[in-house]
Each structure stands twice: as structure tokens, then as C-alpha cells.
């Protein structure tokens, strides 16, 4: 087993928040996270991206990716995402 995997318990997925996950880099990162055994959770305000990119990533990866259309400056909305998921890491691609 590779040391890159943190997903050690069957049926348990380490959830990773991906800000800007509908952009080019974020959506491709989601595919790689899933391939490595992680569960991406995406937040994006779609100001310079399209949700379609994330939908394509889901199709490529063969998995659903939770998505929240919020701005990362919205503390209440972001707190709600953290209350719904056990986020263990954050990858910040929002710009």
C-alpha cells in the first residue's frame, strides 16, 4: 500500500475541501483525489468557472462530488459546509 493513502478504513473517506473546485486546476485535482481514495467537497462561487467542469470530473472519476455554490468569504455558509462534512484538509484554488 502506498504511503500517499490516508484512507485506511474501509467505507471511510477522508474529506478534502477544494475551494475553486469548478475551475480547471480544482476540477482536475478532484479527479486525482478520488483516484487516490479521498472524497473532495467543492465550494465555488462560479464567478469565473462553470459547474459543468465539476460534472465532467464526476463522470471521469465515476463518483459524486458534493458541491456548494458559495463564496469563501461567506463565513456562515462555509461554517455550514464544515458542519455537514468531516473536512480533514483544504486545498485552496479559489481566486
What do these predicted ranges mean?
Residues 1-95:
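N-terminal Rossmann-like NAD(P)+-binding domain of SDR-like oxidoreductases, especially those catalyzing
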